[in-house]
Each structure stands twice: as structure tokens, then as C-alpha cells.
């Protein structure tokens, strides 16, 4: 399996491009973005890497070459600083959440896959921290927006003009003071997971066939008796959906949860140290490695994931730019 890893370093303004080989990162390229580069997302057809940049608010569309290196980008304006981005399932639309500007924007793409200027902005989404595209088993589609300061996950549908409208079934409310931050979706069982930044809990929800979303459970991410500041960051499932990992920035811990294959219930299993202040991480497509950055570290860590238990062991560390935050992994030899 051939894989490429992209790491965004906002303080340095760099995207580091690596080849992942047996738990090691082999440098391929350093790309200067000309700004504070933060959220990264790969297009559904894997031909583009989209990078949000500030303070000149824009998105850069980088063409991805056959070996994973990035070509010269096109540039399009954004309505504000992007804290998180995603595309729809077809690669026609680009969504950007702005935590600082309390909005979500919708940008079309041209026929080649380049992001264009936004055609819609929805304001008054307090601390809109992330955008997550959800496609149901019956063809329904919606956008989930985690609004940290509202303790609400906003739900939107797309109309025939490719614009967002409030979902007729309403929004999802978290516990007061939880601070919903990032979401991830189970690929088959209808469950979705929300990492809450402020109280460091992990919520599991279930989406019914009729579109209703209901809460199933909420678990603490941190070790029993933890007394430090709570500052949750990121979460990801392994490709086989047997394990889920979260990161917390004060303790610099990665937490491992088991996912029951029958009913989806979560079980906290263990905690593992990683780079200082792990703002972002990713799991490779084989499910063998977890790649973690640290905002207060100048290195990125590659952890090996034990196949049977999910336990982490450090495989390697590699130097990167300052303030590393975002990690994305591309599989070059993905089957058609």
C-alpha cells in the first residue's frame, strides 16, 4: 500500500509532504503556502488537496501528482478564517467553518475540481468549529456544523441551488458547557461521534432511517482522577471501525476506545502519550499507524496500532515546521 502524509504547519506556513513506509516518514516535499496554513482536506477523487490559509482568508487548491507531490495551486477567497473544511460526497461543493467569524460558507468547484469563491454564507453560528458531510444509506445528505459556544450541532440540508437550509428535524444539543468541536461517522452502523472540547467527553449518537438523531452515551476521555485543564482536540476511527482514538492537548494524551461490533457501544481502554499539545492526528488507510502532530512540538510522531488490542507504540518521530496542526493521509494505490 502506497501512502502519502500531508502535515500543515501554520506558524511556518509550510505543508510537509511525506511518504509513509513501514512506520517511517520519508520526506518528499516542503510547500510554502504564503500564510498560516491550517485545515487540509483531500478531494473525493483524490486529485486535489485543499488548504485553508489566513490572515488573507483563502483556500488553495493544490493538484496532487501521481507520487503525491503537490503542484502549483489556484486560489479562491473565503469569507473568514477557516477552522475546519470538508467537501460534499461528489466533490462539487466545499464547506468551511469559521470559529472566529461564527459562520459557515459554501463554495462551488469548477469542472476540474478547483474551489471557487463562496456563493453562500450562514452567520450567527457561534464558534462554528467544524463541518462534517453526512450521507445516509437511503441517499439523504446533510451537513453537520459543531457550534462550540452554543453547545449545539447544527443540521443543514442542501436545496436544488446547492445552498444550505435548516434541517426539518432540528439540531442536536449537547450537555451545557460541553463545547462540541469535531465529529466523525461510523461507515456502516449509523452512529456518529462528537468530541467535546471543553469537558473532554465523547458523545455517541445514532441516526435512524427516518433521519432522527438520538444520543446513546457520553464518556470521559481522560484518566480517572485527572485534575488538569480539559482541552479536547480531535478524534478518528480505525478503518475497520473496531477502535476510536481521541486527543487532548493539556495532558498530551491519546485515548483509545473500543467499538462494540454488535451494538456500537464504546469502552474506554487506555491512554497513551504523544507529541506536546496534539491538535490533530490521522490514522493511515491500513489501520496500522496513527500519525500525531503537536502544536508545541517540532516533530510528528508515528505510532504503531496493535491489530488485536488497538494499543499504541511509538514507531518513529520526524521533524516538521512550527505549530503543526493538521494531518491528512492519501492512499495512492486505492482500488478503483
Predicted regions and their residues:
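An edge-strand/N-cap motif at the start of beta-rich repeat modules
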Residues: 1-21
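Beta-rich, blade/repeat-based domains predominating
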Residues: 34-45, 78-94, 121-140, 174-190, ...
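Loop-centered beta-sheet repeat module
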Residues: 144-201
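Short loop/turn segments immediately following beta-strands, especially the blade-tip
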Residues: 18-24, 62-68, 107-114, 156-164, ...
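Short loop/turn segments immediately following the C-termini of beta-strands
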Residues: 10, 54, 99, 109, ...
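Structural signal for beta-propeller blades
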Residues: 14-15, 57-59, 102-104, 151-153, ...
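A short beta-strand motif characteristic of beta-propeller blades
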Residues: 26-32, 71-76, 117-122, 167-174, ...
Amino acid at each position: 500500500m502506497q501512502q502519502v502524509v500531508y502535515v500543515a504547519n501554520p506558524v511556518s506556513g509550510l505543508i510537509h509532504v511525506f511518504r509513509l513506509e513501514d512506520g517511517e516518514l520519508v520526506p518528499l516535499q516542503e510547500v510554502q503556502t504564503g500564510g498560516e496554513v491550517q485545515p487540509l482536506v483531500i478531494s473525493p477523487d483524490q486529485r486535489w488537496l485543499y488548504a485553508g490559509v489566513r490572515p488573507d482568508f483563502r483556500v488553495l487548491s493544490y493538484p496532487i501528482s501521481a507520487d503525491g507531490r503537490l503542484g502549483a495551486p489556484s486560489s479562491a477567497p473565503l469569507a473568514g478564517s477557516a477552522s475546519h473544511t470538508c467537501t460534499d460526497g461528489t466533490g462539487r461543493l466545499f464547506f468551511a467553518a469559521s470559529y472566529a467569524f461564527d459562520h459557515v460558507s459554501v463554495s462551488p468547484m469548477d469542472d476540474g475540481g478547483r474551489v471557487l469563491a463562496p456563493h453562500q454564507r450562514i452567520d450567527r453560528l457561534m464558534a462554528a468549529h467544524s463541518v462534517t458531510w453526512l450521507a445516509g444509506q437511503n441517499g439523504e445528505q446533510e451537513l453537520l456544523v459543531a457550534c462550540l459556544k452554543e453547545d449545539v450541532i447544527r443540521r443543514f440540508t442542501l436545496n436544488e441551488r446547492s445552498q444550505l437550509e435548516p434541517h426539518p428535524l432540528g439540531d442536536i444539543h449537547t450537555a451545557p458547557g460541553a463545547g462540541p468541536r469535531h465529529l466523525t461517522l461510523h461507515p456502516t452502523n449509523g452512529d456518529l461521534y462528537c468530541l467535546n472540547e471543553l469537558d473532554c467527553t465523547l458523545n455517541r449518537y445514532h441516526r435512524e432511517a427516518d433521519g432522527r438523531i438520538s444520543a446513546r452515551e457520553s464518556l470521559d476521555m481522560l484518566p480517572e482522577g485527572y485534575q488538569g485543564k480539559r482541552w479536547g482536540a480531535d478524534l478518528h476511527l480505525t478503518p475497520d471501525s473496531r477502535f476510536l482514538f481521541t486527543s487532548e492537548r493539556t495532558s498530551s494524551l491519546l485515548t483509545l476506545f473500543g467499538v462494540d461490533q454488535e451494538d456500537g457501544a464504546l469502552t474506554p481502554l487506555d491512554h497513551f502519550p504523544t507529541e506536546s499539545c496534539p491538535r490533530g492526528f490521522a490514522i493511515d488507510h491500513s489501520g496500522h499507524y496513527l500519525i500525531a502532530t503537536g502544536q508545541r512540538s517540532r516533530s510528528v510522531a508515528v505510532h504503531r496500532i496493535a491489530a488485536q488490542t488497538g494499543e499504541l507504540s511509538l514507531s518513529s518521530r520526524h521533524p516538521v515546521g512550527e505549530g503543526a496542526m493538521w494531518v491528512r493521509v492519501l492512499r495512492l494505490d486505492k482500488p478503483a
